[in-house]
A protein has these predicted regions:
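Surface-exposed loop/linker segments characteristic of extracytoplasmic
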Residues: 1-134
Length: 134
């Protein structure tokens, strides 16, 4: 799933239309737009399917279904997700301890579910001028 930034979209299922990350409805993000540096910017993250095979991603209508998620709700451990409600609008996987993200420089990194929440959110934006260290 694409990373839309650090704020959620319309709870009425219209998707994320004004994200500050790489992917959101009608976005046209280019490499030159990633001012925080491609090495420090999350682009695509893992998204597991819940054990009950409920909604793998948020149910929505129209043409703006979420194929991208914000980091506002934090990371969710797949092992602790008892039903589909616990998986909505979160990045997570069934891996022990964390999940994979593709960064703007094309690298793939494994991030712990215990990573600092502020760092996680800072890495989801493309031009927040945050200094990220991990």
């Amino acid at each position: 799933m694409g990373v839309s930034g650090d704020t959620e979209g319309n709870p009425g299922c219209s998707g994320i239309t004004n994200g500050n990350g790489t992917f959101y409805s009608m976005s046209s993000t280019r490499f030159r737009d990633i001012k925080d540096g491609t090495t420090n910017t999350l682009v695509v993250g893992e998204r597991g399917i819940p054990s009950d095979w409920g909604w793998g991603w948020y149910l929505c209508g129209g043409t703006e279904c979420e194929h991208y998620i914000s980091t506002e709700r934090g990371l969710s451990r797949g092992q602790n997700v008892p039903s589909w409600q616990g998986t909505l609008r979160r990045f997570w996987s069934w891996h022990d301890g964390g999940l994979h993200f593709i960064l703007g420089d094309g690298s793939v990194r494994f991030f712990s579910y215990n990573m600092d929440f502020t760092t996680y959110r800072d890495m989801s934006t493309i031009n927040g001028n945050e200094v990220v260290s991990f």
